[in-house]
Every structure is written in C-alpha cells, then in structure tokens.
C-alpha cells in the first residue's frame, strides 16, 4: 500500500512449536518459501518449543535476547513470525529488535498484492489488507513497521494511503461496494454458463501443485506458471475439446495453503467459489512434495467449507517423474507428469474416462436424412461407436442427463 524503493531484504524466520502441534516443520518450510517468493533472502530461522505463546513478545525473553543478537550480527532487516501476531506483540517485538516485524498472514497478503493482475483481484487483495490492518492501527495512525517499506507494505497499485481508522473503514465500505458490482456481473456470466450444455471442469489444489501446467498442457496455451507459491490468483476459464468434438470448459483458480488468512478467504470467496459451479473437480497434488498428505487435507478441508464435497472428483498426483514407489492416499487416482511429452493425451484420456462415469450411456439410430445433426451432438456427447447400416447408422455413446433432450431430435 506504500510505495518504496527496492532493496534486498535479509530476513530471519521465527517459529514457536506448541505441544501437540501438527505440521510445524511443514509450516516453517512454507514460511521460508513464502519469504523467497516475496523477494527476501532468508538468512536463518529460530525455533522454540513452548506450552503457549508469550502474550507480550510471542517468544520467551531468553530467546528474544538471542534473536536480538542475531539481528545485529547478521544485519537482519526484517523478522517474519510464523503465526498471527497481536498488535501488542508486533509493537513489542519491533521495539526490542529495532527492525520491521511482520507475521505469516501479512507476508501472504503481501504476495497476493504482488500477484494481483485483474481489477477484481486487486480489489480483493486491497480489501483483505485493509481488514487485516484495521485492528492494528495505533490511535489515529499506523504501526511504524508499515512505514518501513518492502515486504509487508506492498499493495495492488496504490502509492499512498491515508492511514487512520475512519479512512480505512471508508475504504473497506467503498471496495465492498465495488466488489458487489463485480460479483453481480460474475453471477450473470456464471448463470449463463450453468444454463449452457457445455461440461464444466474445475482445477483445484494446493499452491504450486501444477494446476497451471495442466491448464497449459490441455489448452496448448500459455498461462503464467512457475515453481513458486501463488503464481496464479485470478480465476481463468478456457474452452477445449476432448475425444473429438466434446466441448468442455476448464477453470483454474487460486491455489490453497494451510492457515490461509481469513481476510483472504473472505475477500476471495467469490473467486474460490468458481470451482463450486462445475460438473467435475480435478484435484491436483504434487506427489513429489514430502508433505503432500498434509496438502491434501488442507484442500479437502477448504472444499468442505465451500460445500464442494459432493461434486464428482478426479485425483491427479502430479510430478510422477520426481518420485519412486509412490503410495497414494486418495482412491481412485492417476499418477502423471504434466510436463512429459505424452501428458496431453494421457490427461485427455483420464478426463474422458471420468466424464463417461458421470454421463449416461445411450444407443441411437440415426437415419441418413438426419446425419447432419451428428456434428452438433458431438459437442455435448462422447460418441463411442458408429455402426453404419443400409438406412443410416447406430451410435452408442455417453451424454449428460441435462442434454438427453438432444437425442430426441433424431427420433422419427
């Protein structure tokens, strides 16, 4: 939200592991990846085991002294805490350490601000940042760390921001109003899409699982992809043809991550819910990631929150070229490598097989006088066999329940 000059940020990561905490190592590794994605140089990390977080400084006083020495010795410019800090903890840590301190939530918000491309995406990120910022305003101003620039202070195209409570509340109201207009337009487009006979596929998965690679492979078009977190923010929908003429739409949206800030979930709800209005969900999982089971649980949990559990699902374990003797946790599944030469044909075959399970089988006698209508039928159905007879042909295939009326056009 505040424009600053670019310079290298040397960061120190801090994590506190409470008793019985799951996935602490994963969380710390992700924090390092997030920091690198934001452009920081991760110098080191400090970990501490405690029964509870210190209410004043998050870590214990002894550990805080060690951290202060490290900050001075290694010329640390930013400390990133792997947890949501209270405003009080944030201010106290900065006073003791003498450098900018941000938490995991602020870091993720910062990356989203970097990645936002569309008008809607920028509005959603800006709204999430303001909601995060509001309880952290001190009096009529903002904590000093926000004036320091760099990681944690970036915004979607905004150079200056008048930071006081009334201003922030007014901006939140204004952005929410703008988003309602955008969401109304999105709902209109979605309604037309739902009325369409076209089969709809949604890609979901943990961030950096390879969804954009699969999207590019199937569409033969280029969408930004990189080995980094949150490379894609905006929902993207493209049309493709499978098995000849069957037309389907493919939608890719923002990847998930554990502890996704509630401000982002709220702001991006309409974008996340794009995957809710599909006929088939393709859950993409990075099989090479040692924490893929935890990733799966996170995605399934968010799917549950968005009421997406009952949508037919195809599970794809991606990056098969990087693993050996892989054991899946979800059944049924397919193990693929989206970047391999034959991946396009493999993906198309997998999708067609799954669609056949969803569609209903049919057998249709088509007289030669109506054969010209077969081309239109192919766009909404999978034609399995065509047996030519003296007076026409017999077609067997699969079609969606909502499109079975299309078969009536061939009846005498």
Language-model segments: which ranges?
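C-terminal-of-GTPase-core extension/linker across diverse P-loop GTPases
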Residues: 1-13, 138-209, 215, 301-412
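Switch I (effector-binding) loop of TRAFAC-class P-loop GTPase G-domains
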Residues: 186, 193-199, 218-247, 262-267, ...
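Short alpha-helix plus adjacent loop in nuclease-associated cores
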Residues: 107-125
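Flexible beta-alpha connector loops of hexameric P-loop NTPases
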Residues: 18-22, 54-57, 115-119, 160, ...
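Switch II of P-loop NTPase G domains
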Residues: 2-3, 26-29, 52-68, 234, ...
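Conserved nucleotide-binding/hydrolysis micro-motifs of P-loop NTPases
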Residues: 17-21, 50-52, 84-87, 106-109, ...
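Conserved C-terminal guanine-recognition region of P-loop GTPase G domains, centered on the G4
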Residues: 28-34, 68-71, 85-95, 245-246, ...
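N-terminal accessory targeting/assembly segments
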Residues: 1-110
């Amino acid at each position: 939200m505040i424009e600053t000059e670019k310079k290298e940020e040397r960061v120190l990561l801090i994590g506190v592991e409470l008793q019985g905490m799951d996935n602490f190592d994963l969380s710390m590794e992700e924090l390092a990846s997030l920091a690198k994605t934001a452009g920081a140089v991760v110098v080191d990390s400090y970990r501490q085991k405690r029964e509870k977080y210190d209410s004043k400084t998050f870590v214990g006083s002894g550990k805080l002294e060690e951290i202060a020495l490290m900050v001075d010795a290694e010329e640390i410019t930013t400390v990133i805490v792997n947890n949501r800090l209270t405003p009080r903890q944030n201010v106290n840590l900065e006073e003791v350490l003498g450098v900018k301190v941000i938490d995991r939530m602020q870091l993720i918000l910062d990356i989203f601000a970097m990645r936002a491309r569309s008008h809607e995406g920028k509005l959603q990120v800006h709204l999430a940042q303001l909601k995060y910022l509001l309880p952290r305003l001190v009096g009529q101003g903002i904590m000093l760390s926000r004036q320091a620039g760099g990681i944690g202070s970036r915004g979607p195209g905004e150079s200056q921001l008048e930071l006081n409570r009334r201003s922030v509340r007014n901006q939140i109201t204004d952005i929410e109003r703008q988003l309602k207009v955008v969401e109304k337009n999105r709902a209109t487009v979605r309604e037309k899409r739902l009325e369409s006979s076209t089969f709809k596929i949604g890609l979901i998965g943990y961030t950096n699982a390879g969804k954009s690679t699969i999207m590019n492979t199937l569409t033969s078009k280029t969408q930004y992809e990189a080995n980094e977190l949150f490379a894609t923010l905006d929902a993207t929908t493209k049309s493709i043809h499978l098995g000849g003429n069957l037309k389907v739409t493919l939608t890719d949206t923002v990847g998930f991550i554990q502890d996704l800030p509630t401000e982002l979930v709220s702001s991006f709800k309409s974008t996340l819910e794009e995957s809710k209005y599909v006929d088939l969900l393709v859950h993409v999982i990075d099989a090479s990631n040692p924490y893929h089971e935890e990733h799966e649980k996170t995605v399934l949990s968010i799917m549950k929150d968005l009421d997406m559990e009952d949508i037919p699902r195809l599970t794809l374990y991606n990056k098969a070229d990087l693993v050996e003797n892989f054991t899946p946790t979800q059944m049924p599944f397919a193990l693929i490598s989206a970047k391999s030469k034959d991946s396009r044909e493999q993906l198309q075959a997998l999708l067609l097989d799954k669609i056949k399970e969803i569609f209903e089988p049919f057998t249709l006698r088509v007289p030669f006088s109506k054969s010209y209508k077969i081309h239109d039928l192919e766009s909404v159905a999978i034609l399995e066999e065509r047996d030519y007879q003296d007076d026409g042909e017999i077609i067997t295939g699969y079609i969606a329940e909502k499109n079975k009326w299309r078969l009536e056009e061939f009846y005498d």
